[in-house]
Amino acid sequence: MVQVISNLDEFNKLTNSGKIIIIDFWATWCGPCRVISPIFEKFSEKYGANNIVFAKVDVDTASDISEEAKIRAMPTFQVYKDGQKIDELVGANPTALESLVQKSLA
């Protein structure tokens, strides 16, 4: 299941939770975001039991989070562990996204 992060406080609590967090930064008007969204959801079901939290941030409704994360394009997927960004993928590439998830498990 994908968690929705709607404010900076939630973002900070989640990214500092000690778990691996993969966040999809997206926008409702972004075509590629809509295409990859069900794939991200599928990966959350496939890999979510492995101490990884999958989350989404709508960059338009949570602009403070997207500014904090320095988001410049959508979709952007960022991986966090212990409050630090450890990886990032820009673009709607399902193969690269699954590789990012698998690399995060290692």
From Swiss-Prot:
The active site is at residues 30, 33. The record marks 24 as: Deprotonates C-terminal active site Cys. Keywords: Allergen, Disulfide bond, Electron transport, Redox-active center, Transport. Disulfide bonds join 30-33. The keyword Transport applies. The record marks 31-32 as: Contributes to redox potential value. Pfam families: Thioredoxin (PF00085). One of its GO terms (molecular function) is protein-disulfide reductase activity. Residues 2-106 form the Thioredoxin domain. The keyword Cytoplasm does not apply. Belongs to the thioredoxin family. Participates in various redox reactions through the reversible oxidation of its active center dithiol to a disulfide and catalyzes dithiol-disulfide exchange reactions. This is Thioredoxin. The lineage of its organism: Eukaryota, Fungi, Dikarya, Basidiomycota, Agaricomycotina.
